Swiss-Prot record:
Protein name, entry field: GDP-mannose transporter 1
Transmembrane segments: 15-35, 50-70, 85-107, 111-133, 140-156, 178-198, 213-233, 249-269, 277-297, 302-322
Protein species of origin: Vanderwaltozyma polyspora (strain ATCC 22028 / DSM 70294 / BCRC 21397 / CBS 2163 / NBRC 10782 / NRRL Y-8283 / UCD 57-17) (Kluyveromyces polysporus)
A GO molecular-function annotation: GDP-mannose transmembrane transporter activity
Glycosylation sites: N239
UniProt keyword Glycoprotein present: yes
Disulfide topology: none
Coiled-coil portions: none
Lumenal side: 36-49, 108-110, 157-177, 234-248, 298-301
Keywords: Cytoplasmic vesicle, Endoplasmic reticulum, Glycoprotein, Golgi apparatus, Membrane, Sugar transport, Transmembrane, Transmembrane helix, Transport
Gene: VRG4-1
Segments in the Cytoplasmic topological domain: 1-14, 71-84, 134-139, 199-212, 270-276, 323-332
Localisation per UniProt entry: Golgi apparatus membrane; Cytoplasmic vesicle membrane; Endoplasmic reticulum membrane
Membrane topology: Multi-pass membrane protein
Description of how the protein assembles with itself and partners: Homooligomer.
Amino acid sequence: MSDLKLAENNFWGNVANSGPISIFSYCASSILMTVTNKFVVNLKDFNMNFVMLFVQSFVCTLLLVILKTLGYAKFRPFNKTDAKNWFPISVLLVIMIYTSSKALQFLAVPIYTIFKNLTIILIAYGEVIYFGGKVTSMELSSFILMVLSSVVATWGDKQAMQAKSLVESDVTVPVVPFNVGYLWMFANCISSAAFVLIMRKRIKLTNFKDFDTMFYNNVLALPILLLFSFCIEDWSSTNLSTSFTANSFTAMIISGMASVGISYCSGWCVRVTSSTTYSMVGALNKLPIALSGLIFFDAPKNFLSIFSIFLGFLAGIVYAVAKQKKNQNPEK
């Protein structure tokens, strides 16, 4: 990433220019953030998602300021004009990360990861509408696989819930309640697509770099998150002590640091490898994130659930290849 000061020699210079290390770091940061978020929202009686997101944004902002002070990151100082131009993006960011936390709270990590692919479809057709883009036949094939993987994942989830219902009750016909997590996931896909599409326009207006975007996203999100928390969430001492244990607070801090790590490692990976390698890593990374849900949490482990993970994985690879072919052969 051009905004970072990197070592040029000796051991750290070799690390900073290592493709395999950059790829591993990117994957590890992504998994760490997903797992820590799932850990927090799944804690018994935890109900303060806005505060959790506030802590993460605060940690991210603080870490960026420290990196800038040490000379390892560069971004613009805060000013009212940029803040005014960027504020709508931060509002969308808050909606996106809140709906994401709620979806992760109710859905298993593999299902959450698979359904996140649907955001790609919304963004692709959003670009067709707003930027005059084009969807190739190979991209369309990947979209079909994404939708299919989501349908199979839903069947697997329903099958797992039916089996659980039979074990926990004496009924012969299990009653499976609707999982509200799917509604949160749907809202997250829409808000994520809107965030990406509108941010693309705003970046052209403000000429922000990567760390400018991160800094303003998080700084402007802080008061919004706190306001919504005060209005909606229970700030009683009893609820605070229940929601904020040493383990949950530590996980929030780690998650905030991981968000900075993901952004840095994205640029690092592109710099020392190529955009082609990075896009493939992004596609392949879906698999370890989904598998982490099977390892660390009680996610459905039936045939349909496992099959949906590999369908989503295949969809990601097809999409990455389609994007690379599209970039190599731009329309004249």
